């Protein structure tokens, strides 16, 4: 598909329509594969956040919630299914925008759009099922009382999302929030906002009630921070860096506001000596080089049994050399650019520091020689790593994998858990009992056995330790946006009898 001659010029999507940012400022959109400026996005500030939150608040309570927050789940499901259908219709165009905006291979972006549509469809089904789960009875020990549970939308939610999977990560929050009956203000990363703005256009096309979903773009300090601190936002859901997540927690704590956080990771991949090496190498590659390694759950710490380490690394280098690194619009591209010049410089500094600290750059670590422009980095394999090195301890968020050897299962688990993070982990072995033991021992919210990075909308996603808390996807993702209310009634015709009635005069 040919690149469009111009990126659509969008405003902020507030109250069901487009409006220019209050200060009239816009931010350039740079194609990271070419370094060319291809358009711009509106730069929202606190005044725009106020308008968006007000629109969401109005939509939540309009006509007592009859049109959205208190409407039957089947009503909300109709809109979610309509959004999914539009995503499918526009799949090729949206994938192209995503590639131009973020630098990811077009094939990957197209797969992301399929996942976006599937996520909206899944939560449409859960919205419909929610009606049948209301008034769930609670068994009580006293016959003169009856009790049941209502699940109600938590209110207006602020959704702050990252740039690595721009529309998909937004959908992981938008779809369950809307299914629950919440109204929302979505603030995507300023580094990749184009497809999220197109979601606003889709909402307008399908007639989503005004204010149910509002989309503002801009800098984190100017748009994200006012959203996180707004007193009329009932919950914040954030995916991004651990440092930003800490600031959001501090802000929310001042108002006792619930938050869910999906933050950084430094996930391990443990490979034992009983594996098919080429199969395991491909999973190691996919676990750290897909999406140019810009994945929060990337298995960027590779732990190899000492008996196979040399053979494994020889094959890993051979496979890494075979990756097609190119303009992400080219057919067969498997490694595009990273998202921005800032991210490029950050990754290159990690590699430089690893070298200075005594690690070995076994392969990669530089710009591909055939690509003179764009923010491209070769797949990078780093060995002779100690556990005190920055490359072992900190999230790189790029196509960089560091390697250590182990001798025993116990040592492998200790190395795997030697991190402040706890998002994911993986183990590859033909001994399934060993895999089960390790899946219990790894301190993370997700464990993969004989694979790395599969993600299904039906299964919970989230981490432990400094990787955050709360779970997205599946029923757990819907529960993020629901408040549980207990309703108990007294059913006897007799007085309760706790107090003695006053004497009759």
Swiss-Prot record:
<dbReference type="InterPro" id="IPR016163">
    <property type="entry name" value="Ald_DH_C"/>
</dbReference>
<feature type="active site">
    <location>
        <position position="296"/>
    </location>
</feature>
<comment type="pathway">
    <text>Amine and polyamine biosynthesis; betaine biosynthesis via choline pathway; betaine from betaine aldehyde: step 1/1.</text>
</comment>
<dbReference type="GO" id="GO:0071454">
    <property type="term" value="P:cellular response to anoxia"/>
</dbReference>
<dbReference type="InterPro" id="IPR029510">
    <property type="entry name" value="Ald_DH_CS_GLU"/>
</dbReference>
<comment type="function">
    <text>Dehydrogenase that can use N-acetyl-gamma-aminobutyraldehyde (NAGABald), gamma-guanidinobutyraldehyde (GGBald), betaine aldehyde (Bet-ald), gamma-aminobutyraldehyde (GAB-ald), acetaldehyde, 4-aminobutylaldehyde (AB-ald), 3-aminopropionaldehyde (AP-ald), 4-N-trimethylaminobutyraldehyde (TMAB-ald) and 3-N-trimethylaminopropionaldehyde (TMAP-ald) as substrates. Catalyzes the oxidation of GAB-ald more efficiently than Bet-ald. May convert acetaldehyde into acetate, thus facilitating the production of acetyl-CoA in peroxisomes under anaerobic conditions.</text>
</comment>
<feature type="binding site">
    <location>
        <position position="455"/>
    </location>
    <ligand>
        <name>betaine aldehyde</name>
    </ligand>
</feature>
<protein>
    <recommendedName>
        <fullName>Betaine aldehyde dehydrogenase 1</fullName>
        <ecNumber>1.2.1.8</ecNumber>
    </recommendedName>
</protein>
<feature type="binding site">
    <location>
        <begin position="294"/>
        <end position="297"/>
    </location>
    <ligand>
        <name>betaine aldehyde</name>
    </ligand>
</feature>
<feature type="binding site">
    <location>
        <position position="296"/>
    </location>
    <ligand>
        <name>4-aminobutanal</name>
    </ligand>
</feature>
<dbReference type="InterPro" id="IPR016160">
    <property type="entry name" value="Ald_DH_CS_CYS"/>
</dbReference>
<dbReference type="InterPro" id="IPR016161">
    <property type="entry name" value="Ald_DH/histidinol_DH"/>
</dbReference>
<feature type="short sequence motif" description="Microbody targeting signal">
    <location>
        <begin position="503"/>
        <end position="505"/>
    </location>
</feature>
<dbReference type="GO" id="GO:0019285">
    <property type="term" value="P:glycine betaine biosynthetic process from choline"/>
</dbReference>
<keyword id="KW-0576">Peroxisome</keyword>
<dbReference type="InterPro" id="IPR015590">
    <property type="entry name" value="Aldehyde_DH_dom"/>
</dbReference>
<feature type="binding site">
    <location>
        <begin position="163"/>
        <end position="172"/>
    </location>
    <ligand>
        <name>betaine aldehyde</name>
    </ligand>
</feature>
<dbReference type="GO" id="GO:0008802">
    <property type="term" value="F:betaine-aldehyde dehydrogenase (NAD+) activity"/>
</dbReference>
<dbReference type="Pfam" id="PF00171">
    <property type="entry name" value="Aldedh"/>
</dbReference>
<comment type="similarity">
    <text>Belongs to the aldehyde dehydrogenase family.</text>
</comment>
<dbReference type="InterPro" id="IPR016162">
    <property type="entry name" value="Ald_DH_N"/>
</dbReference>
<feature type="binding site">
    <location>
        <begin position="262"/>
        <end position="263"/>
    </location>
    <ligand>
        <name>4-aminobutanal</name>
    </ligand>
</feature>
<feature type="binding site">
    <location>
        <position position="461"/>
    </location>
    <ligand>
        <name>4-aminobutanal</name>
    </ligand>
</feature>
<keyword id="KW-0520">NAD</keyword>
<dbReference type="GO" id="GO:0005777">
    <property type="term" value="C:peroxisome"/>
</dbReference>
<keyword id="KW-0560">Oxidoreductase</keyword>
<feature type="active site">
    <location>
        <position position="262"/>
    </location>
</feature>
<feature type="binding site">
    <location>
        <begin position="240"/>
        <end position="245"/>
    </location>
    <ligand>
        <name>NAD(+)</name>
    </ligand>
</feature>
<comment type="subunit">
    <text>Homodimer.</text>
</comment>
<feature type="binding site">
    <location>
        <position position="262"/>
    </location>
    <ligand>
        <name>betaine aldehyde</name>
    </ligand>
</feature>
